[in-house]
Amino acid sequence: MPAFAPVPVSAPAAGPVGVGTPEHRPDARSDSTRSVLLIAAVALLGVVALTVAVVMFSKPRPVDTSETAAGVGAAVPDGAPETPVSTCGPLQAAIGPLTMRQKLAQLLMVGVTDIADARSVVRDHNVGGIFIASWSDLSMLQDGSLRELQVAPAALPLAVSVDEEGGRVQRLKSLLGAQPSARELAQQSSAEQVYQIAKDRGTKMRSFGLTIDFAPDVDITDAPDNTVIGDRSFGNDATTVVEYAGAYARGLRDAGLLPVLKHFPGHGRATGDSHVGSVTTPPLSELKTSDLIPYRELSTAKPVGVMVGHMQVPDLTDGLPASMSAAVYRLLRDGGYGGPPFTGPVFTDDLSSMGAITQYYSVPEAVLVSLKAGADVALWVSTAEVPAVLDRLELAVASQELTIDRVDEALKSVAVMKNPQLAC
C-alpha cells in the first residue's frame, strides 16, 4: 500500500464583495472600516479551516480486522508511511538457533569416503554439505543410507554434491552409464537432446540424494581434448557454449538439481593447469568479450550457482588466485562482469588438492581467506581437516578477522540454496 501525503486544505474562495456599492447598502460604512472587518473575517475563516484540517488528518482510521498478520490491530494514521513488512521470519527461524560453530560448518562442503565418514562429519561437526568424489563408496547412494542422513533432524538439510560433467569427469559412471564429453555433445547432438540427457541423468542423481552438480563447464576453448579444460568445454565460441551449457543447466534444474557454472571468471584461455600450479588468464577487458559471456547469459535462469576457479587475472586479483580475491567476488556480485548482480550461491573450486592453492595455503587458511573474500561455500575433498578448519574460523570470528556480517551473508545464501522458500 503506497504512503499518502496529506492534501493541503485550500482557503475558501472569496466571493463577490458586497453586492452593489456601499451607497446602495443600508448602514454603509467607510472603506477603512470595511477593510478591517473583511480582514478579520478572512482570518477567522482560516482558523476554522485549519482546525478542521487538523482534526481530519490526525483522526486514526477505524481498525480493519480483515488486515493480515503484519498489520493486525494497528491503527495507521492517514498520511503516515506504513511500516515495511518483514518477510524474513522463516529464514531467521532456520538459522537463528545455530551456534557460531554450526553457522561456520554450514559454509563447508567436504569430500567423503563412505557413509560412515559422512555420518561422522555431519553428526559430529554439523557440516552443511558433502562431496561425492571418484574414490567415494557409491553404495551409500544405492542402499538408502545417504537418504537417511539427509532426513535426520537438522536446522538445514544436508547438501550433497558431485562433479558429473560427462567425458573425463564422471564420478557416477557406474550408476548412470557413460556420457560423451561436452565437446562431443555439442558436435553430435542438438541442444534439446543435450537438455534431455542432462534431465534424465539429473533425475537419477536426485533419486540417489544428490542436490548439486558442479556442471556445466562454461569455459570457452579450442585447446586439444586432453588439456586441462579441452573437451570439457562445449566449444570455442560464446554462442555455442551458451546454447549447449544453457540446455545442460536447464536439464539439471528441471530434474531438481542445482547446476553450477564454472570456472569463473574463465579458465578456457588461461595458461597452465590450476591442478598443478598457478595459472593466468587474459586481462579482464578480454575476458568480458568472450569468457564472461556465458555467465552473463546463463546466470539469470535460477536457481543456479557459480564456482570460482583458482586463476590469476591481470589487473584484478593482485597475484591472488581468483577464489581468494575479494575483487573477483565483487565483480560477480556487483555485475562488473557485464551481467546482472549475481545473488545465487558461490562455491570455491577444491581447496585441498590443487597446486594453485596448496603451494601457498594450508586448508584452514585457504578456507578462511576464501570466505573472507566472498565465497559462500568452501569446497575441499577430505574430512580430516574439518576440526582444524572450524577451530581456525572460530578464532577468526573472535578476533574479527572474519566478520559476523560476512558469516551471516554466506549463511543466508546457503540457507536459501537449500530451501528457496526462505528467500526474503
Which ranges hold each PLM region?
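Second-shell residues forming the walls of enzyme active-site clefts
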Residues: T99, L141-E148, E243-E401
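C-terminal region of N-terminal signal peptides and the immediate post-cleavage residues
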Residues: A28-R34, A49-T83
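Short, acidic/polar
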Residues: V112-D124, V194-K204, K288-Y295, S362-V369
